[in-house]
Amino acid sequence: MVERRNPLVLSSTRSTLRSVLNSSQPSSADGDRVLNKDGDLLRGNARLSAGILRWRKDGENVSDAKLDSLDDSALVGLSTQLLKRLSINSGSLVVVKNIEIGIQRVAQVVVLDPPKTTLEDASLTQVPVSDSLHTMLVFPTYDLMGQQLLDQEVAYLSPMLAFNLSLHISCLKSLVHRGNGVLEKYFEAKCDEEFIGKSAEDGSKIGLDLEPVSQVPGYASHLRVSFVKIPECGTIPSLKVNSSFEAEERQGLIDSALQKYFGTDRQLSRGDIFRIYIDWNCGSSICNPCSQRLCSESDDYIYFKVIAMEPSNERFLRVNHSQTALVLGGTVSSGLPPDLLVYRSKVPMPLQEETVNILASVLSPPLCPSALASKLRVAVLLHGIPGCGKRTVVKYVARRLGLHVVEFSCHSLLASSERKTSTALAQTFNMARRYSPTILLLRHFDVFKNLGSQDGSLGDRVGVSFEIASVIRELTEPVSNGDSSMEEKSNSNFSENEVGKFRGHQVLLIASAESTEGISPTIRRCFSHEIRMGSLNDEQRSEMLSQSLQGVSQFLNISSDEFMKGLVGQTSGFLPRDLQALVADAGANLYISQESETKKINSLSDDLHGVDIHQASQIDNSTEKLTAKEDFTKALDRSKKRNASALGAPKVPNVKWDDVGGLEDVKTSILDTVQLPLLHKDLFSSGLRKRSGVLLYGPPGTGKTLLAKAVATECSLNFLSVKGPELINMYIGESEKNVRDIFEKARSARPCVIFFDELDSLAPARGASGDSGGVMDRVVSQMLAEIDGLSDSSQDLFIIGASNRPDLIDPALLRPGRFDKLLYVGVNADASYRERVLKALTRKFKLSEDVSLYSVAKKCPSTFTGADMYALCADAWFQAAKRKVSKSDSGDMPTEEDDPDSVVVEYVDFIKAMDQLSPSLSITELKKYEMLRDQFQGRSS
């Protein structure tokens, strides 16, 4: 049965109503109507949960005229039952209070009729919060254009009203108290729809008090507003111009937008933030941050802050351009709403999710008002190799928290006098305070490790470091409750809770560096947290490449999955910056190729009259796809060359088992060590220490290096080759640092094989080197420390060493857990073994029919190594090439069966080459290596 509406009480019936209700006792229950001292009817209060109200201006169900009449900065949506409970109508004004913080604002009520529900079906009108959409994990969300059910115990606020009530602070505080797991989900969120079905605990609800306004606020006679400073552009949007004419035009757009905005009554208070929409584009060639900014819903909004209103003794006032004189001028610092609060964010979460979660857990608590947070000093040192995405992570976290980001390069802070560096650093903090609350991002912070190096005095270096540390420590302290800015003091009508919004941590310091090594301990102690960022793993690279290549995958002549798998394997160790450069390079080459192919098709269609251009494009379709793949491969090769370093860049060699002749026993032993942990990781998940080190020893030229490359190729591993002398440096500590860098580079390119060639020169027995500084002893100790960390089954890192003299290597490297698997790679006197080696070396040769590799192998000396047989094959091919050149010079005409570009190697060429070649090993030397094999045979396993 439909409930009867309450009678409308008019002023003329006041005396009659007083006489009727004079004998009744007024009720104090929430939601009941009571009488004030004058006998007027009072409407009840309501305590509700906070929600977010959204609508799309391009929707089909609501006209633009109706949307324009709504005050999006002060709007609250209620159900019909709540309107009856409060005895108000749609369009009435209510006072909304954040119970936790105590901030109050006046808002206009709009009724939200539940779609697809009727009053007869009362059970459907009560929908739990957990079954609705959620904003910021906490706020139930209602979309005017949607068809979801309505929660009867929720007041749905417009995003700007929620921000002015500091509900985002209450939400963040709730998430922090619920633990890091919930906080991580908040920073992973991309849109409201991700939280369908998420349970909302009772403790996570944000409480509101709603009270009908007994008297409509009066009009403000004067209103003063200022632009909110945005450090990304360095200035307000109206000044992002190239000429005075353009500046006047843009200022006119802002004035007209404000005139239209205040064409309807707006409920404002001092300190409120409101925004206007202007459809424009910066277009300035000097504004790089604007040109690089992602396109999103918030780019066309300009934010303003209410500085002063008249009359000043009124807390809430109405503003209308026909009743209020508007003064616009200056800029002011203020935070902006978090991106998830005001719109559905289109910015994807960075690939380094772990770093995002750690940084969020550090920066979120200081933003929550509490006695403990106001005493904590927060400063973060974020370090990682250049291009790993440090700035991207910082900006993403700042958007989620509603903070500005002010960037400075520490190179610009280094003055001619190092004593002035601390002064320049203090000025950057003062600059950042102009945009508070903000994150001050000091890039290239590791330049401070060179302070005082010119003077060379230890006392001067300590003094400069102490000055830098004093500035950081002093300026990262939170503002005490006794401190306040001039702006806060002038706004004496603010409540104590509202003033508290502008105190606390005005500037949060984040310093980014490539490495923390070399930075003075005095400076490092100023940072409360140090966070390290690594490189991308296979899944992260695959995700980034998939997103980047969505538009060009149709041009590739192989399936997307197959191409992506190979590309991910070839980009091991690539950073986000490297991947972006790779895709940009390939895209530029692909565009040029497509342009040239289009010209060919057009010329072909002109020559073939009557043939359609589409048909002509089908003729050359396969060529286009092949060209696109080749362009991408070339871009990958160029990218690898750019990333190559002095110590060698990780790469995947192109050496197959077919290139290695013989050595079947050694192949099997290496595969058991390397391939088994990769294919069956579950077997090693129980904590068993895997054997990840192999030492190949034997005479030179027996194929130790070739064997290591073949293992890396067949197991799809990256290959990092290290020559011993490359790591030795004359400066103290640099050699050990080079060893650490090698293992760090390999970890970033996992799965990876580190190949130490000539290991005996890099890690000789300690105490026997005789160098005055003990450099080699420290290098060996550093290698032992790094290798001991490879036993973890999750490392996917393997080490292979090669040496001619294993007896010179430090014995500690040969114990189990390090280079514990010793494999002898020697010379085999069996003719069939040498035949397999010759087949591998000549598999790309064009041999004559009279060539018998077994006969050639039998004629080879018994001390021939793999290198000797490679020289034999190379000399034989050279003999055949000279014979072909001689025939060409003599004028002999080749037969039809002969290929003019091929060289045919005959049996006699091998014999001539063998006569001119002597073995690289003698019988005596070979016996010495066999004695070494017998000595270490007991350690072989």
From Swiss-Prot:
It is found in: Cytoplasm, Cytosol; Peroxisome membrane. It catalyses: ATP + H2O = ADP + phosphate + H(+). SUPFAM superfamilies: P-loop containing nucleoside triphosphate hydrolases. One of its GO terms (molecular function) is ATP binding. Its main location: cytoplasm. The keyword Membrane applies. One of its GO terms (cellular component) is cytosol. InterPro entries: AAA+_ATPase, AAA_ATPase_domain, ATPase_AAA_core, ATPase_AAA_CS, P-loop_NTPase, RecA-like_PEX6_r2. ATP binds at residues 384-391, 698-705. Its EC number is 3.6.4.-. Signal peptide: none annotated. GO terms for biological process: fatty acid beta-oxidation; protein import into peroxisome matrix. It holds the Pfam family AAA. Interacts with PEX1; forming the PEX1-PEX6 AAA ATPase complex, which is composed of a heterohexamer formed by a trimer of PEX1-PEX6 dimers. Interacts with APME9. Belongs to the AAA ATPase family. Component of the PEX1-PEX6 AAA ATPase complex, a protein dislocase complex that mediates the ATP-dependent extraction of the PEX5 receptor from peroxisomal membranes, an essential step for PEX5 recycling. Specifically recognizes PEX5 monoubiquitinated at 'Cys-11', and pulls it out of the peroxisome lumen through the PEX2-PEX10-PEX12 retrotranslocation channel. Extraction by the PEX1-PEX6 AAA ATPase complex is accompanied by unfolding of the TPR repeats and release of bound cargo from PEX5. Required for jasmonate biosynthesis. This is Peroxisomal ATPase PEX6. It comes from Arabidopsis thaliana.
